[in-house]
Structures are given as structure tokens and as C-alpha cells.
Regions:
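Conserved catalytic loop/helix region of short-chain dehydrogenase/reductase
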Residues: 1-3, 43
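Conserved SDR Rossmann-fold cofactor-binding beta-strand/turn motif
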Residues: 28-38, 80-83, 93-95
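A glycine/serine/threonine-rich, flexible loop-to-helix segment
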Residues: 24, 36-60, 101-103
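Catalytic tyrosine of NAD(P)H-dependent dehydrogenase/reductases that use a Tyr as the general acid/base
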Residues: 4, 12
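Active-site helix of classical SDR
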Residues: 7, 15
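Short C-terminal tail/terminal secondary-structure segment
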Residues: 77, 88-103
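Alpha-helical segment proximal to the catalytic Tyr-Lys
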Residues: 20-24, 85
Length: 103
């Protein structure tokens, strides 16, 4: 867990520094931090995964469910679009409330 947390913190720091360094060139830099996403490779879809495991993972999210891949894609599309033309140097959470559940 320490390596994961350090990697995530490093990514956020890199985004902020790059945004400051190249913002004058009209280049935006952001990160998308997704929560648990219901994909074929998700732990909840692994062979032998139980309903209890799914309930546990969903329970970590304030919305009490995992994201659908399209929901994460929509967040990425927003960051890549002109709708976010004044957004830079940020780490956008699309985690269904996992980050607030732990505070």
C-alpha cells in the first residue's frame, strides 16, 4: 500500500509542477483518479469472487456501487474537452466517494 500511495502522490505532484511549467504555452495538465470500476479484470469478476466480496468493494464507495467504464471515460473526455479549458494542475476524483469514505 505504501508504494501505491507514494506513486499516487508523486503523480499529483508531477501534474501540478508540469501545469505550472507549461501553462503559459496553453497546455493543460491534469490527472484522473478513478475509483473501483466494473471491468472484466476487476477483482469482483475474478473466478471465485463472492457476493460478499462485491458487497465489500461496493460498500467502500459512498455511492455504494462501482463505476461503469463509460463513467470514467466521460470524466476523461471532460478533462480533454474545451469544457475544462480553465482546469489545469488538478487531480480529478471520479471515485464514487471512496476518498471521502476513509476520512
Amino acid at each position: 500500500m505504501a508504494a501505491y500511495a507514494a506513486g499516487k502522490a508523486g503523480l499529483i505532484g508531477l501534474v501540478q509542477v508540469l501545469a505550472a511549467e507549461i501553462g503559459a504555452q496553453k497546455i493543460r495538465v491534469n490527472a484522473l483518479l478513478p475509483g473501483g470500476t466494473d471491468t472484466p479484470s476487476s477483482v469482483t469478476n475474478a473466478p471465485g469472487a463472492t457476493k460478499e466480496l462485491l458487497a465489500f468493494v461496493e460498500g467502500l464507495h459512498a455511492l455504494k456501487r462501482m463505476a461503469q467504464p463509460e463513467e470514467i471515460a466521460n470524466a476523461a473526455l471532460f478533462l480533454a474537452s474545451d469544457l475544462s479549458s480553465f482546469v489545469t494542475g488538478t487531480a480529478m476524483l471520479a471515485d464514487g466517494g471512496v476518498s471521502i469514505s476513509r476520512t
